[in-house]
Amino acid sequence: MKRISLTQYLIEEQRLHNNIPAELRLLIEVVARACKTISHAVGKGALGEVLGSAQSENVQGEVQKKLDIISNDILLEANEWGGHLAAMASEEMETIHPIPNRYPMGEYLLLFDPLDGSSNIDVNVSIGTIFSVLKAADGMQAAKEADFLQAGSKQVVAGYAVYGPQTVLVLTTGNGVQCFTLDREMGSWVMTQKNMQIPADTKEFAINASNARHWYPPVKRYVDEMLAGTTGPRGKDFNMRWIASMVADVHRILNRGGIFMYPADAREPDKPGKLRLMYEANPMAFLVEQAGGAATDGQQRILDIQPEKLHQRVPVFLGSKNEVDLVTSYHKTK
């Protein structure tokens, strides 16, 4: 495969599909540059004194790691001055972050989870950044939270970076999924995988099995059938994988198939799940569908959900299409 840079890919996509105007290309490049900076901070680890807790909580009531706050600040500072955004929203902030008046206002909205899987930071397991781009309403004067509450099908870009043995950036602009690897010597993103595809069938699943006693019947039935192996109703053996880092689990699925599940359960019946719709489930669902997979909340396509609030949570089932369809059918016949 011819090795091309992220910038060259974006320019050629614009020529072919006319879907990446200059302002959007700038936005993608700035986010990619911020991910390089985060990768550098993550890579320093204890040497950079960035490990451990920040002794604070985010809006979700989760204890923040130092790198959560550092990564959030990197993304805010990189993106607020360029004139391509109207506002930003983050897992780490209760309200939206409008672009300061001293900078020009752009026509896009950026949402992100600055450091997904941060429970893994101190033990050197892969973590990452997830982001989603929406179009702002025409003629917007001042961004409000309601402007962000668009269905996932309205996304114009989605992607994530994984900070692991290599740093990779996985991206869709609505025409397939491409993977770029950070060349640390040159400081550039180079395309290393084109048109990633998720096989429709799989023998791997990812779920936190320690919660099994709390699962609702459709999930319990589905997992029990897989665990029964060759002598069970599925007639084949399955392997379980669970990294506790959504970006790492989804990246594996994009490369070799599988199903990722984070269902609602009986621990907190009033909560519809743990993962956030706007900046976790939606961008990952967009990527997975663009790679030929499927993504639902057990009842409907994730990208069809109309959000009601910025930090809304949803159950998530995504990955190989035939498996997602099967577990979704169990929810509909419960």
Swiss-Prot record:
Keywords: Carbohydrate metabolism, Cytoplasm, Hydrolase, Magnesium, Metal-binding. GO terms for molecular function: fructose 1,6-bisphosphate 1-phosphatase activity; magnesium ion binding. Mg(2+) 2 binds at D113, D116, E280. Its EC number is 3.1.3.11. It is found in: Cytoplasm. Substrate binds at D116, G117, S118, S119, N208, K274. Homotetramer. This is Fructose-1,6-bisphosphatase class 1. It comes from Herminiimonas arsenicoxydans. The gene is fbp.
